[in-house]
Swiss-Prot record:
Binding-site residues, NADPH: T13, G14, S15, I16, N127, E129, G213
Protein name: 1-deoxy-D-xylulose 5-phosphate reductoisomerase
Catalytic activity, as annotated: 2-C-methyl-D-erythritol 4-phosphate + NADP(+) = 1-deoxy-D-xylulose 5-phosphate + NADPH + H(+)
Keywords per UniProt: Isoprene biosynthesis, Manganese, Metal-binding, NADP, Oxidoreductase
EC numbers for this chain: 1.1.1.267
Species in which this protein is naturally found: Pseudomonas syringae pv. tomato (strain ATCC BAA-871 / DC3000)
Function: Catalyzes the NADPH-dependent rearrangement and reduction of 1-deoxy-D-xylulose-5-phosphate (DXP) to 2-C-methyl-D-erythritol 4-phosphate (MEP).
NCBIfam families in the cross-refs: Dxr, PRK05447.1-1, PRK12464.1
Metabolic or biological pathway, per its Swiss-Prot or TrEMBL entry: Isoprenoid biosynthesis; isopentenyl diphosphate biosynthesis via DXP pathway; isopentenyl diphosphate from 1-deoxy-D-xylulose 5-phosphate: step 1/6
Chain positions recorded as 1-deoxy-D-xylulose 5-phosphate binding sites: K128, S154, E155, S184, H207, S220, N225, K226, E229
Length: 396
């Protein structure tokens, strides 16, 4: 490819978006920012636009768009401001775009990510919900469009690096026995079970290793994040749920492992910094400097592993059940979790009630086949309705 790659960053003001911009800025001859999108931190989006001079910016509604357009003009920029989901899809699929960082959190990221896939882009997938909600439809679109799908979650990027290039032939065909997803265990890995009832949002968001947004920090604490990653791994690598094992590894130095039938286990190691998988995906199949410090094994000293405790992490069990059920179950799991986590962060429910809401939603609604995107969003809406009804009956 001649000239720099033009990059759209969906979710530019989040932690993944900011890390992407850090890597991009290190290689101005290789990458050029084409579009930036933001949702609520619009002052930060303005500052990023001034720094990176994209051709487009996208915000959620018209009032914010007019203000941002005026502020950009005052700064001497001719960046064009677009609005809403239509704007997101436009900058994701734009003919001038080479690569799209899909980093919008939650179900809101599905349509623009799918737009990038259908346009045949190189898609750097940080929005795991896109695959969780609509895995079969999403992967079918990848195959039909010829899009290049590169995982950004550190675990899936690690697996991608440890698998042979022809893994699409099937894990069995390339000699893979199982995939092992590592997890830090979050802030409550050793908290006495009786104390979990009184966990606060601030405690749940204080991750011991990674710096993340509030929603994903809670998901990490409950290990729902790992459950969603299990479902994502099944779609990315055409694995059965029983081929994906979760291992708690508190140091977060080994990002995941691949176990082969000959007894070999390949692992990818690195300091816990999202710039590593971002740089790997941006440059693939080449390599570029990410700005991450070299790994110092002498300083780390030891690596520990343990099996997840199902009583401590019921969300992981629920996610595995949804993966095994298939159909509408993963979309409903994700939607119920989004509602429950938002309620917990707002102080409306207790920490341990997150899993209870999700389990009730999954138990109340039968699993149905997902034959199109409308069915995905119908399952999502139904789960949100049921979770909302639970909150009306039970919130404190």
């Amino acid at each position: 490819m001649s000239g720099p790659q033009h990059i759209t960053i969906l979710g530019a003001t989040g932690s993944i978006g900011l890390s992407t911009l850090d890597v991009v800025a290190r290689h101005p001859t290789l990458y050029q920012v084409f579009a930036l999108t933001g949702f609520s931190r619009l002052d930060e989006l303005l500052a990023l636009c001034i720094k990176h001079t994209p051709q487009y910016a996208v915000v959620p509604e018209q009032v914010a768009a007019r203000k941002l357009q005026d502020d950009l003009a005052a700064a001497g920029l001719d960046t064009r401001v677009l609005v809403g989901e239509g704007g997101l899809c436009e900058v994701a699929a734009h003919p001038m775009v080479d690569a799209v960082m899909a980093a919008i959190v939650g179900a809101a990221g599905l349509r623009p990510t799918l737009a990038a896939v259908e346009a045949g882009k190189k898609v750097l997938l940080a929005n795991k919900e896109a695959l969780v909600m609509s895995g079969a439809l999403f992967m079918q679109a990848v195959r039909q469009s010829g899009a290049v799908l590169l995982p950004i979650d550190s675990e899936h990027n690690a697996i991608f690096q440890c698998l042979p290039g022809d893994f699409a032939r099937g894990l069995g065909a390339v000699g893979v026995r199982r995939i092992m997803l590592t997890a830090s265990g979050g802030p409550f890995r050793e908290t006495p079970l009786e104390q979990l009832q009184d966990v606060t949002p601030e405690q749940a968001c204080a991750h011991p290793v990674w710096s993340m947004g509030r929603k994903i920090s809670v998901d990490s604490a409950t290990m729902m994040n790992k459950g969603l990653e299990l479902i994502e791994a099944c779609w990315l690598f055409d694995a059965r749920p029983d081929q994906v094992e979760v291992v708690i590894h508190p140091q977060s130095v080994i990002h995941s492992l691949v176990d082969y039938v000959d007894g070999s286990v390949l692992a990818q190691l690195g300091n816990p910094d999202m710039r590593t998988p971002i740089a790997n995906a941006l440059a693939w199949p080449a390599r570029v400097d990410s700005g991450v410090a070299p790994l110092d094994l002498f300083r780390i000293g030891q690596l520990d592993f343990q099996e997840p405790d199902e009583e401590r992490f019921p969300c992981l069990r629920l996610a595995r059940q949804a993966a095994e059920a298939g159909g509408s179950a993963p979309a409903m799991l994700n939607a119920a979790n989004e509602v429950a986590v938002a309620a917990f962060l707002d102080g409306r429910i207790r920490y341990l009630e997150i899993a209870g809401i999700i389990e009730e939603v999954l138990n109340r609604e039968p699993v149905t086949a997902v034959v199109g995107l409308d069915a995905v969003f119908a399952a999502d809406a139904k789960a949100r309705l049921l979770a909302g009804q639970w909150l009306e009956r039970n919130e404190r």
